Design a protein with these regions (language model features):
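Extended alpha-helical targeting/anchoring segments
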Residues: 2-8, 14-174, 178-533
Length: 533
């Protein structure tokens, strides 16, 4: 049972409490602390929490329990436990509100609005949930969790409406001067929404260091004592839920057809050459061309996520189950992070497969750093990152903290850099996402023209691929990864999407093979050993 403290007095909550197997747990911060905070009238809500000794072995065990009581769940974690973000895995269920954008309509709960400016509508919603940074709390205490699709870009860039809108038909003027390149006909539309977020005011944080759980409930700061008592009661309900034996459920899924690609090898190579014509004519410098692969699938992606954790541990591991979509992923790359006013983005570009021995691994890393084409591509994307952060950062604050480091993952290695800035007064997490998305590593340069051509040349919409996935905290902090190395399921099909950066001297066959190689960890997690058709 959780108890709360006022000044020096600990008081057991009133009302009937659920039975638990644990001794009373102290709730923090105290009611006295939040009473003082409420008087400041700066914030509308605040988190309260209690710590719970856990019988769960992994965050996945907690997730399995939550799925017995809610279809809508998420798990955000990091396989890099040495990093600060890796200490906690975050879970949630039963969202307070769902927000999604589909068919040019924004849905906020039961309210439908024309999707003219979805970002501003979400900003207005978040103003109702303004929370302080409190000591001894994890980095995420509640907020929005979900994804923003690549095509969401058209809401802030009206010039892209034709290219990224309802179809992939070519917009007027999207071929380079002197060329006859035409758009590839769309073969099927990616079923992901333009935006799919869930608002959670309760969070379960799994401490990977101590294997304890931190249970978090956000309470309103008006009538603070009443809401504090209610919050403590809700914490006790969480304790009871987590101590209730969960029935076993089948979490395995199976690919039931060959995986087919939107582009055949010949089509992809021909499209690379058409992109290179635009580069040679000075229309763009680089473009990331992608290929979508899909298959029929039965069952859940939870088992697939478990395999991804094992074979492709990454800085951003995520499982997300929304109204009509299930997503599992292991992204290596941050889109943008905002923590207490400091912005970071981490461009990754340039790829080699991992070696089979330490010596071969080192040799491939040296080869990658010596590759002028790969380094030139990476430098271009670092410059894009600096420019993106510069639009919302204080003058002179944008710096490259780390340059041309080798970042190694389970199957591949990349060249990585770190760009930092300090966000200007008047800008927020939503502005930061808008400034950086889509990442140059998933679009090209110049970014807007590259995106226009992507809409022209690619056969299907990208959806989550190349978009953003993560959280925006009630405190204003935010951490979003790039939507890559992911698998999602909808309407009985799974989708895997990978891309390659095309520059003037790219070899088309090599770029096609890079797309297939990047998909290998996803295929392995799905248990698929066949060829791509």
């Amino acid at each position: 049972m959780c108890t709360y403290t006022t000044d020096n007095t600990r008081t057991t909550t009133t009302g009937t409490q659920p039975h638990t197997q644990h001794a009373p747990r102290e709730v923090f911060p105290t009611l006295d602390t939040l009473t003082h905070l409420a008087r400041e009238q700066t914030y509308t809500i605040a988190p309260i929490a209690c710590e719970l000794d856990s019988h769960f072995t992994t965050p996945l065990d907690v997730l399995r329990m939550l799925q017995t009581v809610s279809h809508h769940v998420y798990l955000l974690e990091s396989a890099r436990q040495a990093h600060a973000r890796g200490r906690y895995s975050f879970l949630g269920f039963n969202p307070k509100l769902t927000i999604f954008c589909e068919n040019e309509t924004l849905h906020i709960g039961d309210v439908e609005l024309p999707a003219r400016n979805p970002t501003e509508a979400i900003r207005q919603l978040l103003r109702k949930y303004k929370s302080p940074h409190l000591p001894n709390m994890p980095s995420f205490t509640g907020g929005l969790v979900g994804y923003i699709a690549f095509e969401y870009l058209r809401y802030k860039e009206p010039t892209l409406t034709a290219a990224l809108g309802a179809t992939n038909a070519a917009a007027p003027g999207t071929t380079a001067p002197g060329t006859t390149a035409t758009a590839n006909p769309p073969i099927q539309q990616t079923p992901a929404r333009d935006l799919d977020l869930m608002l959670f005011d309760k969070v379960i944080a799994f401490d990977n260091k101590t294997h304890k759980l931190i249970l978090i409930v956000n309470i309103k700061l008006n009538h603070v004592e009443e809401h504090y008592r209610k919050g403590v009661f809700e914490l006790n309900e969480l304790v009871h839920l987590l101590n209730t034996p969960a029935p076993l459920r089948n979490e395995e899924g199976h690919v039931t057809s060959p995986i087919t690609a939107a582009f055949t090898k010949q089509e992809f190579c021909n499209t690379v050459r058409r992109v290179q014509t635009h580069i040679q004519n000075g229309d763009i410098f680089q473009l990331v061309l992608s290929n979508q692969m899909s298959a029929r699938f039965t069952g859940s992606l939870l088992g697939t996520y478990r395999e991804l954790r094992r074979i492709n541990p990454s800085p951003y591991m995520f499982y997300f189950c929304g109204t009509d979509i299930e997503v599992a992923g292991a992204s290596p790359e941050t889109l943008v992070e905002l923590k207490e006013g400091v912005l970071h983005t981490y461009p990754l570009a340039g790829t080699r497969p991992r070696g089979t021995t330490p010596q071969e691994d080192d040799a491939r890393a040296a080869e990658l750093l010596a590759d002028k084409k790969e380094c030139a591509e990476h430098n271009m994307l670092v410059d894009l990152g600096r420019n993106d952060l510069g639009r919302i950062s204080t003058f002179g604050s944008v710096v490259v903290e780390k340059f041309h480091a080798i970042e190694k993952f389970s199957h591949v290695m990349h060249i990585g850099s770190t760009v930092r800035g300090h966000i200007q007064h008047g800008f927020d997490a939503l502005d930061a996402i808008a400034a950086v998305m889509p990442a140059g590593t998933l679009s090209g340069a110049p970014k807007i023209r590259a995106c226009e051509l992507i809409g022209t040349f690619e056969k299907v919409k990208r959806g989550i691929y190349g978009g953003a996935l993560g959280y925006i905290d009630f405190t204003g902090n935010m951490d979003m990864c790039i939507g890559i190395r992911l698998i999602y399921k909808k309407a009985g099909r799974v989708f895997v999407h990978t891309g390659a950066g095309i520059v003037a001297d790219s070899i088309p066959e090599h770029e096609f093979n890079e797309c297939i190689h990047k998909a290998k960890s996803s295929f392995a997690a799905l248990g698929y050993t066949g060829e791509v058709e």
